[in-house]
A protein has these predicted regions:
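Adenosine-phosphate binding glycine-rich loop
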Residues: 59-60, 256-257, 362, 366-476
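Glycine/serine-rich phosphate-binding loop and adjoining beta1-alpha1 elements at the start
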Residues: 131, 150-265
Length: 476
């Protein structure tokens, strides 16, 4: 096992910095809590410090949208300024410089983050993303969304997120493994089953989680499978985890349609994005909702057929050819064209910002389901609402993944293995309960589902904060 860097702790819960000079597979780590001021190490380059933003700085786009939505939902609640302040800032942020050896003996330098937003209801929980455009602002925004997501589902968890700015498509499998292990070596002091539990996210998967849990257990010298979820089943991963986000989102869609008195059976769905979530949504859509899938796309190509796209034919073509180009199951459309095709529901399973102020007026779907994080901008979402298009927000629509991750934690803690049937039944029950609670909140306050979901989450988090004495108010 590679030698770990010597860590210098400066003030309890404030700053953690590495005192070693850089070398292959080592790192610099800076951990900051609340508004603690970082103390620069002489070995730390100024570029690293220049790239760090204080938590209290003016938020940029992604985080600003989340905070604006939270402040909008506050009007439905009795929340003090202090309580809102706690909700609006990260509890802890860790930024690390990761130095990873290339296959040719040279070295990459990456920057990784772990943002731990709020743990009033339980340990921090959130995925790890590998992406070229990953930023600290994006990681913060997604950590705040995870705080809301776990609370909407009433899970005993908080919210966090991690990310590394890299292009995994340019890395070999051994290089991705070394990067994954380096990230855990940098972050392990702030991770653990009772502290912060990562999971897969964009461009990370069960294989990556397997490397990460192995590295964590090697450092700690004991088995700790509950440290990371989304692992391979042989390492304690839960059955049903790969399809959990899609299954959860379809269950929510089906429940909302029933609440509206508009069953989906026989109607049409368009799925924008065909990664893990989108492909599983295509596979499961008819069984869960009774609807037919009429459109699919990846980042470069798409298909549309108003009569329906058979999953087996389309997925097999995609797997063989890497895109939908030339697939005879439907007419070729671009990803942009697919967004504006008519459908009973449009499932957004690709990236952030797919619907914004420029294209929201062209959307023809009756409902939009956010299976990705922040796929609808604040302006785009408002225009959809103004046009009477119902939006199922990401903190409800894609919460199936974290729910089954929680099931995985429960199984790991008790050394049990649930059947897939048990996982699916429990997931559908949890998603139905959360959907009913959000719809009830929306009806009681005459508001949209996003505002209702955020308000419900904030209400539950603030109750936990008050019970902990984190405000001048008390729940007693």
């Amino acid at each position: 096992m590679p030698m770990l860097p010597t860590l210098l702790y400066v003030d309890h819960w404030s700053t953690l910095i590495s005192t070693n000079m850089p070398r292959p597979n080592s790192h610099f780590t800076v951990t900051r809590d609340f508004d603690a001021t970082p103390i620069a190490s002489p070995a730390m380059s100024q570029d690293v410090w220049d790239g760090m933003e204080p938590t209290g700085s003016e938020p940029s786009s992604h985080l600003a949208e989340v905070l604006n939505q939270m402040h909008g939902a506050r009007s439905l609640l009795d929340v003090s300024d202090l309580e809102m302040e706690v909700l609006s800032h990260a509890r802890r942020e860790t930024t690390a410089q990761l130095i990873v050896q290339r296959d040719d003996g040279d070295h990459f330098v990456f920057v990784g983050h772990r943002v731990q937003w709020n743990d009033a209801r339980g340990p921090f929980k959130g995925g790890i993303r590998f992406h070229p455009a990953e930023t600290l602002d994006m990681t913060r925004a997604l950590a705040a969304l995870m705080m809301l997501k776990t609370a909407v589902l009433d899970l005993p968890l908080g919210g966090g997120k991690g990310g590394v700015q890299c292009d995994p498509a340019t890395l070999s499998r051994p290089e991705r493994e070394r990067l994954s292990r380096s990230y855990i070596r940098a972050m392990h002091p702030v991770l653990g089953p009772e502290l912060d539990i990562p999971a897969p996210d964009m461009n990370t998967n069960a294989e990556v989680m397997g490397w990460m849990v192995d590295e964590f257990e090697s450092i700690r010298g004991r088995h700790a499978p509950g440290t990371i979820t989304g692992k391979p089943p042989v390492l304690g991963g839960s059955r049903g985890r790969p399809e959990a986000t899609a299954l959860g989102g379809l269950s929510v869609l089906h429940r909302v349609a029933d609440h509206m008195g508009k069953p989906l059976a026989g109607n049409s769905l368009v799925i924008h994005g065909y990664g893990n979530v989108g492909s599983h949504a295509h596979q499961l859509a008819t069984d869960i909702t009774g609807a037919r899938v009429t459109g699919v796309c990846d980042s470069r190509s798409g298909l549309f057929n108003p009569e329906g796209l058979p999953y087996e034919e389309v997925s097999a073509w995609k797997q063989r050819h890497g895109s939908f180009v030339g697939c005879p199951a439907g007419s070729a459309v671009s990803p942009e064209e697919l967004l504006v095709q008519p459908a009973s529901a449009l499932l957004l399973a690709s990236m952030e910002g797919m619907i914004d102020g420029h294209n929201a007026d062209d959307i023809q779907a009756e409902m939009v389901v956010e299976l990705a994080n922040q796929p609808t901008s604040q302006e785009g979402g408002q225009r959809l609402l103004d046009r009477g298009i119902l939006v199922i927000p990401d903190i409800l629509g894609n919460a199936g993944g974290v729910t089954v991750s929680y099931f995985e934690q429960v199984q790991n803690a008790s050394w049990q293995r649930w059947s897939r049937t048990q996982v699916v039944e429990q997931l559908q029950q949890e998603m139905a309960s959360a959907t009913d609670a959000v719809v009830d909140m929306a009806h009681r306050h005459d508001t949209d589902l996003r505002t209702a979901a955020i308000a419900l989450a904030m209400e539950r988090i603030v109750e936990a904060q008050r019970s902990r004495g984190w405000s001048s108010r008390s729940s007693m």
